[in-house]
Amino acid sequence: MASLLLAATLLSSDMAAQEKYVYNEFYFQRSSLFSELPVGKKDIVFLGDSQTNGCEWHELLGMKNVKNRGISSDVIQGFIDRVDPIVDGQPAKVFILGGVNDISHDLTPDSLCTSMEKLIVKIKQGSPRTKIYLQSLLPIDNSFGRYRKMVGKEQVIVETNRLYKEMAERHGVTWIDLYSKMVDPVTGSMRKGLTNDGLHLLGAGYLVWRDAVLPYVKK
């Protein structure tokens, strides 16, 4: 997550922040591979960052037509910059999860929602037949002490999810609440046993994720 560099320049107090991203080597390695791999009209695409990247989705879901398009350290602007090969393939479904790396760079919930909306509009305009599913950000657990840039960001995640859900409803996009299925209601952190670093999932976490999305994947 920390290996992706971001520089944000505020143009003025009444204008949105403009973000410029310098992507790491892994971003280009993986995105260049994705540009060579075909996406078909029957395919189901999972688009995201390291949390998506870390799963063998076709095996977990038992479906050969599921494509993993996750890149570790990626941000929402990165999704926008590399989504064209997905859109060109006119897939049946796209499941999106992203924003935690943006939060680590101190972007606001409003900024994240604006970027996510741009991504969704781009997909809808380029591939109207594609069904889009926006998944909530996952809870974190700062007790591991691994990601100092995420310290104190629990409520930013909650607020971003609120804005994401409202935006998804405006655009007729299906909202999938992963957060409530993984959060400890007492501590507000990710449930024990789902992560071993406070951010990325263990196998048990991916099973929770699978159970949440499977009805939509099979639909």
What are these regions (language model features)?
Residues 46, 66-68, 175:
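Conserved beta-strand scaffold positions in the cores of enzyme catalytic domains, especially
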